Structure formats: structure tokens, C-alpha cells
Curated annotation (Swiss-Prot):
It comes from Pseudocercospora fijiensis (strain CIRAD86). PANTHER family: MONODICTYPHENONE CLUSTER TRANSCRIPTIONAL COACTIVATOR MDPA, PUTATIVE (AFU_ORTHOLOGUE AFUA_4G14580)-RELATED. InterPro entries: SAM-dependent_MTases_sf, WH-like_DNA-bd_sf, WH_DNA-bd_sf. Transcriptional coactivator; part of the gene cluster that mediates the biosynthesis of an emodin derivative that may be involved in black Sigatoka disease of banana. With MYCFIDRAFT_198930, coregulates the production of the PKS8-1 cluster product. GO terms for molecular function: DNA binding. This is Transcriptional coactivator MYCFIDRAFT_190109.
Length: 360
């Protein structure tokens, strides 16, 4: 019975969003259902039925018969539109895709993105990532859904706080897959001797970040911003640390991670004392998180499988991936592991290049 109720609640949330009902209800006070029905063009009787079901979940309520008012929960969907975007993605995309997982499995001859549950649900050969690029609304909703699911904001900043940056003196740090300068600006304020190179894969983003005014001229002097395309060979060869953080919204695949590792192989080979810090969201190993946190992580993992036919990596799989990167002179090896103090799903690996001893 609870599952049936959740199904109807999701359908009602989609209905409210589709007809922009929530925006017609004042954040304070109430409004007559008839007025809302007139504004949105929906039948008043259906509106009342939807509101009364949602009220059982604390979303909207009737202070008096025929009157509609917001609760704290429903009001948040008006003041923070990303919540509504997330709800619409859940109802319009995530739910129907999940229901087509069995059909997709029956039809799959391989795990190409074009054979995903998403492609079955919407009868398309276009991969989900490509659809997000073309359709701004879908991309916005997916980003909002990812943030609400705890996807977009990982624990990498906390992880980096565990490192002994002061021991590096006036060394150069490269943030090689940056989405913004936020992390580097924070580190630059804390460690006034360090120098930074921020590499972004979008020329417009580079220009935008370059126009941001640092808090001091000293920080500006110690920070360079440059463009670097995904998987392009690392050209900065004299850094002490390379930070490799891949975007978390569309979580990186093993292929993407491997390509970035190989792109940094030459830089670490040229400087054996340099360290590459690989930070990426991971699927927690069974039983390492509390049940609610593990459930959220596994919901995200299954949603990713259904949308893209990609899955999250566990820590052991990530280490195996790193250990497989090599050239004729040596290979990568993991020299340290960092864990978030409150999330086994976030980790960072310290990686160095190990030369192969030459035969006498």
C-alpha cells in the first residue's frame, strides 16, 4: 500500500509542476481552490483531490475546506526551484526509465549507452548524455536531481584538508579538471607560499573565472588559469601535485578516468617526486555506511546504470584501474589513500610514477 501511495504522490507532484500550481499559491496565507483552478486551467475537483493526497505527506494543506496553503515542504519548492526541477526529473525521467530496466536487459546484446533503459523508455538511440547537451531543461533537471541525491557536492574539499600542504613550500599545484577556481582560491588563502594552475576545458569558463576578482593581489599573482581539453596530455611538467577531480554530475566512467590518468603519465614520469591526487565519487562497499546512506548511493548507482549503462566504481576497482596504467619505462602505483571522515563513498588516491628497474 505504501508503494502505491508513493506512486500516486509522484504522479501528483508531476501534475502540480506541469500546471505550475505551486507558484499560484501564496507563500503566506491561503487561496481559494477555485481561484487556483482558474489561474492554471485545471478542474477544481481534480485540484482538490491532488492537494488532499499531497497533504497526507505534508506537502500543501487545506486550512479550511476549499482553501489551499503551502506547508514548509511545499513552499520550499517555490523558493528553491531546483527542488521542483529534481521532482520533475524523478517523475518524468527517472521513474519511467527505472520501470524499463527489465525490458532493456532482455534487449541488450551489449552495454552501449544506446541500449540503456533510457533508450527503451523513450524509444531513442540518442544517449542520455547527448540528450542533456541538446536539451537544456533536461540538463537542468538532471543537475538538480543529482544535487538532491547528494551527487554533485562530494567530500573532496574535506579530503584535501587532510593533506600536509605546508610541507610543499612554494611548489606549484595543478587543478587539472577544474569546474571553477573555488578550491584553489581556498587553498591559496590558507597556504600563502603555494602557486596554482587551474585548468578548465571550456574557453568561456576560463574567461569567466579569469574575470573573478580574487580577495587579494597576492592570490591573483600566485594563480594562473588556462584551458585544457579533456584527456589532453598534461603540459605542466614542474608541479609537485596534480589534482584530478572529474565532474560528479554525470559521474565519470572508467574510460574517462583511464584517459585522464594516461594524460598525466608523461608529467609524472618526468618528475618522479610529483604526486597525482585522484578524487572521484565511489560506490561504497557493502556495510561500510549506515543503511540510509548506502541506500542513497545504490539508488544513484542504479539510476546511472539505467540512464547510461555506466556504473560507479568501488575503491578496489579504482585501484586496479590505476595500477593498470603504465608505459615501457614504468607504471603508476597507489602510495596513499584518503577517506572522507563521514562518507565511505568519497575517497582520494595518491599516485606516483614508479620506474621499472633496468636490467644490468
Amino acid at each position: 500500500m505504501q508503494g502505491m501511495a508513493l506512486n500516486q504522490l509522484l504522479a501528483c507532484l508531476k501534475w502540480l509542476g506541469e500546471f505550475q500550481v505551486l507558484a499560484c499559491i501564496p507563500l503566506k496565507g491561503s487561496i481559494h481552490a477555485r481561484d487556483v483552478a482558474d489561474l492554471t486551467g485545471v478542474p477544481e475537483t481534480q485540484l482538490c483531490r491532488v492537494v488532499r493526497l499531497m497533504a497526507t505527506a505534508g506537502f500543501l494543506h487545506e486550512p479550511r475546506p476549499g482553501q489551499i496553503a503551502h506547508t514548509v515542504l511545499s513552499g520550499a519548492f517555490v523558493t528553491d526551484l531546483s527542488l521542483l526541477d529534481a521532482g520533475m526529473f524523478l517523475s518524468e525521467t527517472a521513474a519511467p526509465v527505472a520501470l524499463h530496466m527489465a525490458t532493456a536487459t532482455e534487449r541488450q546484446s551489449d552495454l552501449q549507452a544506446s541500449n540503456s533503459a533510457y533508450s527503451v523508455a523513450f524509444n531513442t538511440s540518442q544517449p542520455f548524455e547527448a540528450a542533456c547537451v541538446e536539451r537544456s531543461r533536461l540538463h537542468r533537471q538532471w543537475s538538480a536531481y543529482s544535487r538532491c541525491a547528494g551527487d554533485a557536492e562530494d567530500k573532496t574539499v574535506e579530503l584535501f584538508g587532510q593533506l600536509n600542504w605546508r610541507s610543499l613550500g612554494s611548489a606549484t599545484i595543478v587543478d587539472s579538471c577544474a569546474q571553477s577556481t573555488d578550491l584553489v582560491l581556498e587553498l591559496a588563502k590558507l597556504y600563502p607560499s603555494l602557486h596554482f594552475v587551474v585548468q578548465m576545458n571550456n574557453a568561456a569558463a576560463v574567461q569567466q573565472e579569469a574575470c573573478r576578482r580574487p580577495e587579494s593581489e597576492d592570490v591573483k599573482r600566485r594563480m594562473k588559469i588556462q584551458e585544457r581539453m579533456p584527456s589532453a596530455p598534461q603540459t605542466v611538467k614542474d608541479a609537485a601535485v596534480y589534482i584530478l577531480r572529474l565532474p560528479a554530475t554525470l559521474r565519470p566512467s572508467a574510460v574517462q578516468i583511464l584517459a585522464e590518468l594516461r594524460a598525466h603519465l608523461g608529467a609524472l614520469r618526468a618528475n618522479s617526486s610529483a604526486t597525482l591526487i585522484l578524487a572521484t565519487p565511489l560506490l561504497p562497499e557493502p556495510g561500510t555506511l549506515d543503511p540510509d546512506s548506502e541506500a542513497r548511493a545504490r539508488v544513484r548507482d542504479l539510476a546511472r546504470l539505467q540512464l547510461t549503462n555506466e556504473t560507479d566504481l568501488e575503491l578496489s576497482e579504482l585501484i586496479e584501474l590505476v595500477n593498470g596504467v603504465h608505459d615501457s619505462n614504468g607504471r603508476f602505483r597507489v602510495v596513499s589513500k584518503l577517506r572522507s571522515r563521514d562518507s565511505a563513498a568519497t575517497a582520494a588516491l595518491g599516485i606516483k610514477y614508479q620506474a621499472v628497474p633496468t636490467a644490468p
